[in-house]
UniProtKB/Swiss-Prot annotation:
Protein's gene: recA
Xref: InterPro entries: AAA+_ATPase, DNA_recomb/repair_RecA, DNA_recomb/repair_RecA_CS, P-loop_NTPase, RecA-like_C, RecA-like_N, RecA_ATP-bd, RecA_C_sf
Subcellular location: Cytoplasm
NCBIfam families according to UniProt: tigrfam_recA
Biological source species: Acinetobacter baylyi (strain ATCC 33305 / BD413 / ADP1)
Gene Ontology biological process terms in this record: DNA recombination; DNA repair; SOS response
Principal location: cytoplasm
Record protein name field: Protein RecA
Keyword DNA repair: yes
Function: Can catalyze the hydrolysis of ATP in the presence of single-stranded DNA, the ATP-dependent uptake of single-stranded DNA by duplex DNA, and the ATP-dependent hybridization of homologous single-stranded DNAs. It interacts with LexA causing its activation and leading to its autocatalytic cleavage.
HAMAP family: RecA
Bias kind Acidic residues: ranges: 339-349
């Protein structure tokens, strides 16, 4: 760049900085650009599939799937992990279905969890935006998009048509929340439900509620499905769950994670820790015996899990080694491009 252009650029940057504040415009290679912080999902397998060790702070995340697939469980686990790291969390319960006792069992500090049960969609999204702008919240969960009923629909008659009202509401809210979330480094997780498109002959007939806006604004989209049952004898004690990373602006997408969700306990964290440790040869398996650093730690997987429960420092040590090995591999791959996406059709519902 010649001197005149360089001086003109410097003058423009100084003016922008004076008017809008420091770091409004930065060079992409500047050291001031920080790596994205991540909040663990509570599942080590899913953290690795996401490529950055969890869900990204300061971004919009969508978790969707069929009923009883583990969507709320996943978000409550993320809240528990965020609170353990010293974060403050909020839960906007538009479905009016949050169970405090279940949340406590999953490790959520319910005494310090902010909860709102809004009357209508506008109120829910306004509360979310105000909490984001406060700069004091690290993680907000909105459960769910389908329950964000516009005020006009609540106040209207039962048979009234309100075409595209919820889609327009979501698009307007996300335009505000996305930028505010980035500035305050607050993650906003939207739980969403699945609907069927009528008359689809080819491709998947499934779609999510609330229009297209959330698909565009979300940095991470997770599709969660129950694929089997976990049994102890004849008793069903949990479900086998598969999560597909459908969209990821932070790392390569389309990875999958399979793990168990145990009823009343949440993700079987120690079970997947043992499996990954054996897979990475951190824990050696010979027949039914498992050994770590030359010492036998149990015969059979259940005994190893019991040993790790009694020795949490060893499970923490093993987890740190797994994260170091697998997340380094993930970060070496080319990240997905964070393309500029066009504004979605507001009226599509």
């Amino acid at each position: 760049m010649d001197d005149n252009k360089s001086k003109a650029l410097q003058a423009a940057l100084s003016q922008i900085e004076k008017q809008f504040g420091k770091n409004t415009v930065m060079r992409l290679g500047d050291n001031t650009v920080q790596a994205v912080e991540a909040v663990s999902t509570g599942s080590l397998t899913l953290d690795i599939a996401l490529g950055i060790g969890g869900l990204p702070k300061g971004r919009i995340v969508e978790i969707y799937g069929p009923e009883s697939s583990g969507k709320t469980t996943m978000t409550l686990q993320a809240i528990a992990q965020c609170q353990k790291a010293g974060g403050t969390c909020a839960f906007i319960d538009a479905e009016h279905a949050l169970d405090p006792q279940y949340a406590r069992k999953l490790g959520v500090d319910i005494d310090n969890l902010l909860v709102s049960q809004p009357d209508h969609g506008e109120q829910a999204l306004e509360i979310a935006d105000m909490l984001v702008r406060s700069g004091a919240i690290d993680l907000i969960v909105v459960d769910s998009v389908a329950a964000l009923t516009p005020k006009a629909e609540i106040e209207g008659e039962m048979g009234d048509s309100h075409m595209g009202l919820q889609a327009r509401l979501m698009s307007q809210a996300l335009r505000k929340i996305t930028g505010n979330a980035k500035r305050s480094n607050c993650m906003v997780i939207f739980i969403n439900q699945i609907r069927m498109k009528i008359g689809v002959m080819f491709g998947s007939p499934e779609t999510t509620t609330g229009g297209n806006a959330l698909k565009f604004y979300a940095s991470v989209r997770l599709d969660i499905r129950r694929i089997g049952q976990v049994k102890e004898g004849d008793e069903i004690i949990g479900s086998e769950t598969k999560v597909k990373v459908v969209k990821n602006k932070m790392a390569p997408p389309f990875r999958e994670a399979i793990f168990q969700i145990l009823y009343g306990k949440g993700v079987n964290q120690l079970g997947e820790l043992v499996d990954l440790a054996v897979q990475q040869n951190i824990v050696q398996k010979a027949g039914a015996w498992y050994s770590y650093q030359g010492n036998k730690i149990g015969q059979g997987k259940n005994n190893v899990i019991r040993y790790l429960e009694e020795n949490p420092q060893i499970s923490t040590e093993i987890e740190a080694v797994i994260r170091e090995q697998l997340l380094t591999k993930a970060s070496d791959q080319t990240a997905a491009h964070d393309e500029t996406e066009e504004e979605p059709d507001l009226l599509e519902s």
